[in-house]
Structures are given as C-alpha cells and as structure tokens.
Amino acid sequence: MRSKTLIDRIEGEASLYLEMAQGRVAKAHIAFPHFRGMERILEGRKAADALVITPRVCGICGHAHLMAAARAIESAYEAAGKPIMLSPKAEAIRELTLVLEMIQNHFKWLYLVILPELSKLGIGGLPQTPLKGAFAASLATKVLALFAGQWPHSSYMLPGGVTCDPTHLERVRAVGMLDELAAFFERETAGTPLENILAMESCKSFNPMQSDLGLLEHGLLAAHMHEKGFAHDRFIVLGEHGFSTAARVLQTRRRKADAALVQTESAVCPDERTYADNVRYDGGFYEAGPLARAMAGDVTLIKNMHRRKGASDP
C-alpha cells in the first residue's frame, strides 16, 4: 500500500511517500516540490549580498545561515592571503546569539510540536502546555535581540565581527533574562538544577525525574518508541564552535571529520519532482543535529542513553 503525507512543520513544505508491507514501512521517498534556490540567486552578486540573502533561506535558523555566510567570506579573504582576525568580544557575541537561536528552537520544538504530536499517537500522561514553549522561546529571543536586533532575519554579522557594541545596561539585562530562562528550565522542563543534569551519567539518574523531560521519557519508553525507526548509528558534526568541534561518531567511537569529504547529489522521488539534494559523508549517510552534537561532545548521559536504548533513541 502506498500513501502520501504532507510535511508542513518544516521551513517550506515536503511530501512523504511511504510503501507499507505488513504494517511496516518498506520504502520511503521524500520530495521538496518548491524551488528555493538561494545558491542560484547568489550567482553573479557581490559577496556581501550573501549576508542579507542567505539568512532568509530559513525562518527557523537564520542566525546559523548568517554565520555560515560571514565565515565563508572570511575564509575567502584567508585564501587570498588576507586573513581576518575576530576580536574575542565579537566571537563571543556570535556564539551567544547562535546558541540562543538553538535554545529557543528547542523549546518550541518540544512544547509546540513533539509533545502534542506524541499525544496524537495515544501516548498518555504527557504535559500539554504549549505556552511554556512560547514563554521560554520569547525569553531567549529577547536576549538575542539585544545583540542582533530584529529576529529572525538579523544581519548584524559582517566579515571581521559584528555591528553591535552592547552597553553595560544591555549586558545586565541579558544576564537577568538568561538567569530567568535557566530558572524556568530547571523548574518546569528538567525539574532539577542544571548542575544535576550535567552531572548525570546514567539513565537510572534520569528515570525518577517528575518533570516534563521525565514524563516525556516515560511516555516514549512505554510506547516502545526506542525500538522503532533505527538509523545507521553514524553521527556527524562539522561546525566549529565553542560548544562543538568537527567530529564523526561510529556507534560510540569518535573520529575526525573533514568537510572536504561531504558529497551532494540530486535526490530522486519517483512520484513527484523534487529539488532536494542527498548529502553523504565519504559515501555514507550520517545523522546530524542535537543528538549528533551530544554524541560527538561526549555528553555522558546522552551516550549512556544511546548505548542502553539504541541508535533510534529520540
């Protein structure tokens, strides 16, 4: 049996085609039918135009694209023998705003997407509090706006640094809101201080938590979600930041990663025209994203969960 499902909780729209056999997915194809073509739009333009155009490829992670554009231009200068050195302040502001974008995205994804969708699958006992996600995301965005201005499509990064120079009052406001955000996470999401989370080394420490994260884990295990949808058990991180380094992980073995080994090719969907690309590393598919960063960063709790629950552990 074949079925088509529209995927609309992404930036853009995609079609997912599934072939079912005995109640299981036998084949899957995904199509992105709308051409976006930022790389085509940039052809023939001045390099600085990328700082404005590239972030608009996505309303969810514009800061990541802005940083990629700024770094690409800086790399071009370096290749031309004119390296650009960032000041420690500019580097710190770039890192802070990028992390804040990730944080607000994670809060929205958890409370506005994951928990409601899992409840639709019949997993009971999960918190249905979408306003928690909206509140936490707004706090992160307010801090981000102090340094980057408008959100989501900020253009405050330039080759060599940033356009902002935060005042003492702005820094104090940022620290206050960050403290409020951390306290919210500890109270509502984790149910325990951050120090306790970071010190955990085993699933056994996580299981008794009566918090939104604890209830989520209980629901996922009760529904046997950790036994479904196994991937290749290969993870990759290519971004070089204060919180991550380029690496790949095969099961639990950490290896070096070289961006030169990334290959792209046009994807094929037999049911619909698609403008997507398949991306491989040295010929193989790898998982990227938050789990990959935790695995490559040797986060003990996450690696323990992965080892005990398997490669599909959400």
What are these regions (language model features)?
Residues 1-314:
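Active-site bordering "gate/hinge" segments
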